[in-house]
Amino acid sequence: LDEMTQHAWRASGFPPQRVLGMAGVLDTARFQALVGLTGVARADEVSAWALGSHGEEMVIPLSQATAGGRPLTELLPAAELAAIVDRARGSGAEVVGLLRSGSAFLAPGRCAADMVLAMAADSGEVMPAAVLADGSYGIRDVYVGLPARLGARGVRGIVELDLRPDELVALREAAERIRARLGALVS
């Protein structure tokens, strides 16, 4: 997704704030649903971010994840949280496997619509989106999933969360892997 979004931006001639991708909203919703299955809170009471890239390079900063206002790290054992993060990373493939033909389209469509509605309403809502990194998180000039404030003209800005060092490293590594794949596409 990140690579396709970067390619679309380059091909479009639009300013980068007008070109963004949707994966993080869906991945976040899937993580919230998985936490909800544990019984510690309803999915709509879970606050979390799916950043980085879609799939194995997804970064869910547990330092920022809460349920009912309480840190998830206080509500669930570390091993259970790690298993939930792993399942969230593979949930797209899991859905495709369950469908047996085709791919998920309802949930991704709903998440994309939520992003469009936030922009149409000029809401300033912060959502995870594939955006052109501007130096935030020490990442620059590559599309990667980051918290983005959305408005009528697209991305108003990138919001910097207070990530733990290991979470920041994982996010930067995801960006570098995206950059490497982009380089391989060009050569």
Describe the role of every protein-language-model region:
Residues 12-18, 27-187:
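C-terminal substrate-binding/catalytic lobe of Rossmann-fold NAD(P)-dependent dehydrogenases
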Residues 3-12:
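Short Gly/Thr/Asp-enriched flexible loops that form oxyanion-binding sites at enzyme active sites
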